[in-house]
Amino acid sequence: MPRHKLIASESDVSIEVDEGKDKESCVYYVEVEENCERGKIKQASRDGKRRRERNGETRRKASEKRTNEGESKKAEKKHEKGHRTARKAGEKHGKRQRRKNAGEEDAEDKSSKEKKNMKNEKNKTLKLEEEKEKDVRKKKRKHVKNEEDETNHEKTKQHLKEEKRRKKRKKPETTSESESKSESESASESESKNSPAVGVLGSLTPEELENLKEAVEERKKLITQLKGKPWPMRRKLVVLRESQEFVEKYEGALGKGKGRKLYAYKVMMMKKWMKFQRDFENFKTACIPWEMKIKEIESHFGSSVASYFIFLRWMYGINMILFGLTFGLVMVPEALMGKPYGSLPRKTVPREEEASAMNFAVLWDFGGYAKYSVLFYGYYNSQRAIGWLKFRMPLSYFLVGVGTVAYSYMVVIRTMARNANEEGGGDDTSFNFSWKTFTSWDYLIGNPETADNKFASITTSFKEAIVEEQESRKDDNIHLTRFLRVLANFLVLCCLAGSGYLIYFVVRRSQKFALEGLENYGWWERNEVNMVMSLLGMFCPMLFDVISTLENYHPRIALQWQLGRIFALFLGNLYTFIIALMDAIQLKRAEEEIVKKNMTIWQANLYNGTVPDNSTAPPLTVHPADVPRGPCWETMVGQEFVRLIISDTMTTYITLLIGDFMRAVLVRFLNNCWCWDLEYGFPSYSEFDVSGNVLGLIFNQGMIWMGAFYAPCLPALNLLRLHVSMYLQCWAVMCCNVPQERVFKASGSNNFYMAMLLVILFLSTLPAIYTIVSIPPSFDCGPFSGKPRMFDVIQETLETDFPAWFSKVFSYASNPGLVLPFLLLLVLAIYYLQSTSKTYKRVNMELKKKLQAQNEENKKKNKLAALKAASDLEQARKAGEQRRNSISDLGVNEENPESHVSSSHTSRPPASRGHTSSGHLPGHPQQPQKNSKKR
C-alpha cells in the first residue's frame, strides 16, 4: 500500500494530554476510527511512537535548562544571604567593640545573665524530667484506680441484681422488706467501704443510680422509724450505725459538682446544729436545780410527794426574782448612795436602847441595830434623789413594791394556763398496764443506782395505776358515805371555829399586854400570838387527816379536801392576825399624834433660854440618838411579819427533827426489844404530809407578799428558808419517811396548788393595798414621810419630772369616769372568753366520747375478726386431720381385706385395736370411717 494511505489524517486521530501532569510523564491517547484497518492502525502507532520520542527529547532538554536556571538563582540567593549575614556580623562586632570601649560592667552583667539563663535552662530541664516522672506515676495510679473501679462496679451490679430479685420475691407492703433491704445494703456497704463512692457512681447506669437513691431514702426512713421497732438495743445500735454510714457515703456523692459540695456543707452544718441543740438541752437539764433529787424521790414515793418538791423549786425561782428586785433596786442603792448610819434620827438607835441593842434576844426579835437598818421600812430617807446618780429612792421603793405583786400575778396565771393546756389532752386509759409493762424501761441506763431508781419508779407507777383502776370500779353504799361525809364536815367546822376563837382571844390578850408594856412580861407573853398560830398550824392538819378517813374519797380528791380545810384554817389565822395588826396600827397612830405635839414643845424648849448681856451662846448641837421620834407603825408591821416567818420556820424544822427523825430512830433501834411491832403498829414510820407542807409553803409565801412592802428583807429570808428546806426535807423523806399505803397519781394537783396560791396572793395584797391607799404614812420615818398618802409619790414625779401635758393626760386617764367603763369592758371580755372556752371544752368532750366509742367498736370488730380467723383455722385443722385419717383407713382396708370383713361384726373398728390415731381414745369410734363410707 502507498505510504500516504497508511498515514492517518488529522480528522481520524486525536491526541489528548493531561495538563495537570509534567510533560515527561504525559500520557497520549490515540483514538482511531473504527473503520480503519489493522495495518493502518499499526503504521499509525509506529508514527506515534516516533513522534513521542521526539517530543520527549525536546521536553527533557527544556527541563534541563529550567533546572540549571533554578540552581543558578539559588546560588545567587545564597550568595546574597552570605553578604547579609557578614554585614550583620560586622555590625554586631562593631557594637561589641563599642560596648567594650564604653566599659567592662556591661560585659559582666551580660555574663551573669548568660549564667542565669544557663541555670534556668538546667532547672527547666530538671522540671521537665520530674513532670515526666509524675505523669508516668499518675498514669500508673489511674490504671490501678480504673481496675478497682471496674471490680467495684461489678460488685455493685451484682448487689443491685440481688436486691431486685429479693424485691420481686417479697411483697412491698410488709415490714420485713425494709429489714432485708437494710441487711443487703449493709453487706454491700461493708464491701464497698474501702472504695470511693464517687468513682463507683460514675460507672453506674441511670437505672442503678435510681435504685441507689431509693436505697438511701429507705435507709433514711429506717433511721427515723428505728425507735418504734421492737428490736433489742444492740441490734438497733448496729442498724443505726450502718444506716448512717451508708447515707453519709452515698447521699452526698449522688450530687454533681457544686451541688455535691453544697449538699455536703449543708449536711455538715445540720449535724453541727443538731449536736449543738442536743448539748444545749443537756446543759439546760443540768442547770435545773435539784432535778436528780426530785427524780429519786419520785421513783420511791410517787408523783404526789414529788409534786411538793417541784412546787417548792418553783417557789424558789419566784423568790429569786423578788429578791433580785428588792435587793438591787431598794437595799443596795440606799446602802451605797443614801446617808450613812447615825446621820439622821431614823437611822440611829435611840439613847435608851443603845445598852441592849446588840443583845442576842433583841437581835433575834429583829430589834436594836437590826431595826434601824436597810432591812426595814423606817430606815429609808424621804429625799427625792440620792447620790451622784440622782437615784429616785421613794419612786423606786413604790414601783418595786407594786412590781413584785404584778410579776407574781403574771407568773401564777401563766403557770395555771400552761398546766391547763397540758392537762387538756385527756388521758388514754386503753391498754394502760400493757403500755407500762412493755414501754416503761429505759434501755440507755448504765448506772446501777439509776437502774434501781427506775425500777422503783416503775413499781410506784404500777401501784398508782392499780389504785386508779380500783377506784373506778368501786361500788359503795351511797347513803352511808353521805352520812359520814356530812359528819366529817361538821367536825371540821367545829375545829375551825375553835381555832378562830382561840386566836381572837390571844390577840386581845396581846393588846392588853401591849398597853401595859411588854417589858413587864416574859418571852411567852411577848410571842404568844406567833406561837399559838404555829401550834395550830402543826396540830390541826393532823386532826383533819384523821377526820378525812370517814369520807372514803379517792386519794387525789381526799388530798384536795384536806388542802381546802387547811387553807381555811390558815386563812382564818392570817386574817385574825391582820385584824390584830390593824388595831396595833391605830394605837401607834394615836401615839404618833402625841409625839408630834411633844416635838413642838421640845423644840421650843431647845431654842428658848436666858443668856447674859454682851455674850454669845455656842451653837446648839443635838445628837440624833437624843432626838425624840415617832413609833413608825410601818417598821412595827414589818417586824411582826419577820417574827412570824422565823417562828414558823423554826417550828417546821423542830417538828421535822422530832416528829420524823427521832420517831424513825426510835422505831429502828427499839423494834427488836419492844413488846409489839413498832414498824407496823404504833408509832411506825411516818408518812410525808403533802397537804400540810404544801399549805405551809403557800401561806408562808402569802406572808412574804403581804409584808415585803414594809420589810424588804423578807424575800431574802424566804429564799434562805426554801433553800434549807429543800435539802433538809429531801434528806428526811429518804431517811425517815415511808411511802403512803395508797400511792396515787398527782397529775391534777399542781394546778390545784396554783389555784390556792392565786387566792392567797389576792387576799394578801388586799391589806397592803388598803394601807397604801387609806392610811397616812409616819411623819418621821420611811421614804414617804411628810406625804398625806404613799401613792402621792407618783403625782409628785409627774409634776416635777414630766411635761405638763403628760400629767394632764395621766389625770384624765385616772378619772373614775374612764376607769370604770374600762373595767366593765374587761369583765365583759373575760365573760365572753370564758363562755367560748366552755363551748370548746364541751365540743372536745363530745369529740372525745365519739373517738372512744369508735375505739370500742374497732376493738369489738377486731375481736370478732380474730375469733372468726381462729374458728376457720380450727375447722381447717380438723378437716386436714379427717382427710389424713380417711386416707390411712383406706390404705389399711386395701392391704387387709379379711380383717376388714371380720371387723364388721365387732363394736369398734380394727384401727383402734392397734395404733390409735392422734386425738382419739381407744375403744371409741372415729369419724373418718363415716367419711370413707360416704366416699
Curated annotation (Swiss-Prot):
Instruction: Report residue spans for region: Disordered.
Output: 1-21, 37-204, 874-935
User: Which residue windows does the record flag with biased composition (Polar residues)?
Assistant: 899-919, 926-935
What reactions does this protein catalyze? Answer: Ca(2+)(in) = Ca(2+)(out)
Location(s) in or outside the cell? Cell membrane
Tissue expression profile of the protein = In adults, expression is restricted to the hair cells of inner ear and lateral line organ. Expressed at higher levels in the larval lateral-line neuromasts than in the larval inner ear. Expressed in the sensory hair cell patches of the ear at 4 days post fertilization (dpf).
Q: Which Pfam families match?
A: TMC (PF07810)
- Spell out the InterPro entries in the cross-references: TMC, TMC_dom
Give UniProt keywords alphabetically: Cell membrane, Coiled coil, Ion channel, Ion transport, Membrane, Transmembrane, Transmembrane helix, Transport
A GO MF label: mechanosensitive monoatomic ion channel activity
List this protein's GO terms for biological process. Answer: cellular response to mechanical stimulus; detection of mechanical stimulus involved in sensory perception of sound; vestibular reflex
Task: Report what the protein is called.
Answer: Transmembrane channel-like protein 1
Taxonomy, top ranks, is: Eukaryota, Metazoa, Chordata, Craniata, Vertebrata
